[in-house]
């Protein structure tokens, strides 16, 4: 139901789609302030979405979300949606996982987002930070949860094997942290890479998570008709494959981003939320339309979409399907 109160501890009630905030970073948008965020939030919340995902690392994202949510508070009270944000990543090469900074960052996020609590806080991109520092930051998040400042906490990152191992480790007595509540995985369940499917059971059963969130379903601009953004860390070969996939889709009168969106939703619906990055009302409505197309077909792809996906994965991506790129530092403690 729209505008229904949510239980911040019940992550199972997070909507199937989550409104993302990375698009408000200058990496993706030259003028984030020009995005009609208030209209986007109002439309999203009026059509079943009840969660946002942001981060201090995403430029002015928290500030812009905070302003928009504050302006909409009479129509959408704070207790009718989840706010998910992150801590620890400051810049492309700058991280601070100290307990003091984690605490400072959480309180700063509360101020920016005009809230007294955060529903979920992820430790941002853990693969870039040394293991002992990760543990200290997670212990501080546990303390903040015990104090009620945050309701849930977890980790985010790209290398799904390390993310899974770390989540499992936290659930052991040795960690002195306790089970995490959630993991946000990005670029691991999309048209080019579906490895997240192989790790979900471990994350839920062994790590005892409440929620596994799937983000970057267009693989940070790789899976779209426009050119892949320059900052994307994938190989030249994979970039070329994506370009070929876009051309193939165009020949079939299908947009690659639409197909990729439907694929990710069909694979993850019922398993966890999918984070959407939209920068306009048109993109939001298109994403919701794609969701409804999949939902109306029993949460499956149409036969045409299924054939297109199979061709792209087997005949275009070929050996580059499930190809990964380097991210983070070595973690020899992972066994």
UniProtKB/Swiss-Prot annotation:
This protein's UniProt keywords: NAD, Oxidoreductase
Gene Ontology biological-process annotations: dehydro-D-arabinono-1,4-lactone biosynthetic process
Gene3D superfamilies: NADP-dependent oxidoreductase domain
Binding residues for substrate: 124
A GO MF label: D-arabinose 1-dehydrogenase (NAD+) activity
Positions bearing the site annotation: Lowers pKa of active site Tyr: 86
Protein name, as recorded: D-arabinose 1-dehydrogenase
Organism: Saccharomyces cerevisiae (strain ATCC 204508 / S288c) (Baker's yeast)
């Amino acid at each position: 139901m729209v505008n229904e109160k949510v239980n911040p501890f019940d992550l199972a009630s997070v909507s199937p789609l989550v409104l993302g905030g990375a698009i408000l970073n200058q990496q993706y948008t030259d003028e984030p302030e020009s995005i009609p965020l208030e209209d986007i939030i109002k439309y999203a919340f009026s059509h079943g979405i009840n969660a946002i995902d942001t981060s201090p690392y995403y430029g002015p994202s928290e500030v812009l979300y905070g302003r928009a949510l504050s302006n909409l508070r009479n129509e959408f009270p704070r207790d009718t949606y989840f706010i998910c944000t992150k801590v620890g990543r400051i810049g492309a090469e700058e991280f601070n996982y100290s307990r003091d900074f984690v605490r400072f960052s959480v309180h700063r996020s509360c101020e920016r987002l005009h809230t007294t609590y955060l529903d979920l806080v992820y430790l941002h991109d853990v693969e870039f930070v040394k293991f002992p520092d990760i543990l200290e930051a997670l212990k501080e998040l546990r303390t903040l949860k015990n104090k009620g400042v945050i309701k849930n906490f977890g980790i985010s990152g790209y290398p799904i094997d390390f993310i899974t191992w770390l989540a499992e480790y936290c659930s052991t007595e040795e960690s002195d942290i306790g089970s995490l509540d959630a993991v946000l995985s990005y670029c691991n369940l999309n048209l080019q890479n579906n490895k997240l499917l192989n790790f979900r059971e471990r994350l839920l059963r062994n790590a005892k998570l409440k929620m596994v969130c799937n983000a970057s379903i267009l693989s940070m601009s790789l899976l779209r008709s426009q050119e892949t953004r320059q900052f994307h860390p994938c190989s030249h070969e994979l970039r070329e494959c994506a370009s070929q996939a876009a051309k193939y889709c165009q020949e079939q009168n299908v947009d690659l981003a639409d197909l990729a969106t439907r694929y990710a939703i069909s694979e993850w619906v019922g398993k966890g939320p999918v984070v959407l990055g939209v920068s306009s009302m048109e993109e939001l409505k298109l994403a919701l339309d794609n969701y409804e197309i999949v939902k109306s077909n029993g949460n499956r792809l149409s036969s045409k979409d299924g054939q297109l996906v199979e061709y792209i994965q087997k005949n275009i991506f070929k050996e580059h399907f499930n190809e990964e790129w380097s991210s983070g530092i070595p973690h020899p403690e992972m066994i």
